[in-house]
Amino acid sequence: MTKKITVIPGDGIGKEITEAAVAVLKKADGKFGLSLEYDYHDAGGTAYDKFGTPLPEETLAAAKASDGVLFGAVGGDKWDSVEPTLRPEKAILGLRKGLGLYANLRPVKVADALVQYSPLKPELVKGVDLVIVRELIGGIYFGDRCESEMKDGAERAWDLENYSVPEVDRIARLAFETAKLRRGKVTSVDKSNVLATSRLWRRTVEKVHEDYKDVTLDHLYVDNCAMQLAVRPTQFDVICTGNLFGDILSDEAAVIGGSIGMMTSASIGEQTSLFEPIHGSAPDIAGKGIANPIGTILSAALLLRYSLKEEKAAAAVEAACDKALADGFRTPDLWTEGFKKANTESMTQAILDRL
C-alpha cells in the first residue's frame, strides 16, 4: 500500500535539505520496497508571502491526511517586522496543535567520526546514544497563568504546573516502547522530592512499568540528570520527562554532539507525526548549496522508524550517514584540514552511495 509523505520545505535552506532527505528516501524506497509518494506544501515565511498566513489550511489538511510529515525549517530576518501572530514560526506551533503532537523525541547519537567536535572529553562522548522523550502539550507551559497581580502589597506573577494520569501514562508508554527498540532502559526524570506533579509523574510511570517488565526503569531528579548528562552521558538510553524539564535537558544534550546540523527530532501524534532537524532556516547560507543535510536525512530515518515502522530501512539510512562521515566527508560546518570538503549535494551523494 502506498504511503504518503507530506514534505514542507519552509524557508531558507529548507528546500535544499528536504530535497536531500527525499533523495535518500527514494533510494531507500527502491532498496526496501516502501511504496512512498510525496506531497509538497508551503509553510512559514514562504507561505506568508504567498497566502498571507504562515500555515495555510491546505498545508494542515495535507499533513493530517498523510502518513508522516517531513519538515525543513522556517523563519528569517525578512519577516521580523511581521505581526507576531503571523510570524513564520507560528507554522510549527500550528502544526503541533493541529496534529495533536503530544511528545517530542530528541535522539542524541555521536558518531565515532565526530567525537572530536564535542565540547566534552572524547572518552566521555564516545558511544553516546540516547533519546529524550519529552511530553509536549501539558505541564507548566500549558497551565493557567497570571502575568501580574497585586497581593499583600506586592506585584507578583504565577504559572500553574498541571499533569493528569492519562497524560503521563501516554508519554511513559511511548518511552517504554522506544526503549524496546533500543537497549531496554528508561530513566524517568522528575523533581518528586519537591513537586506534587512530579510525585504523580513517578507513581504513574512506575504503574506503567508493570506492563513493560522487560525494560529496566530508574529515576533521577532533574538537577542530577542535568549533571549526569555532562559527567557520564553514555549511561542513558531513553530519558522520559515532562515538558519544562525536557525542554531544558534536550538543549543541553544537543550540545554533546558538537554540531547542530546533525541533530534531529520527532514530534509524535496519535495519527500523524512530524520529523525535522533542530537547526534553523539559516538564511545567510540559503541558496549557496553548503548546508549540512544530515540532520534532515536522519529526520527522514526517524520517519521511517516511527511512522512507517520500517526499522531496517531506518537503520540503513543511519548507517549510510555514519559511513559517509567515517570516510571523511564534511560540510563546511564540520570541515577541518585533512577531511574531504563536501557541499549539500556531494554529502547527499556520499550517503546515497553508501545506502
Language model: regions and residue ranges:
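N-terminal beta-loop-helix "entrance" segment that forms/cooperates
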Residues: G33-E57, M227-L229
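Extreme N-terminal starter segment of soluble prokaryotic enzymes
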Residues: M1-I5
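Buried hydrophobic packing segments
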Residues: A21, L25, V205, T296-S307, ...
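Glycine-rich phosphate/pyrophosphate-binding loop and the adjoining helix
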Residues: I137-G138, G143-R182, V186-S188, S192-V194, ...
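Glycine-rich phosphate/nucleotide-binding loop
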Residues: G45-A47, L229-F329
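Buried hydrophobic positions in well-ordered alpha/beta secondary-structure cores of metabolic enzymes
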Residues: D11-G14, D67, V133, A175, ...
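Glycine-rich phosphate/diphosphate-binding loop of Rossmann-like nucleotide-binding domains
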Residues: T6-A23, A28-D29, D152-D223, Q235
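N-terminal glycine-rich phosphate/adenylate-binding segment common to multiple enzyme folds
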Residues: D49-W158, L244
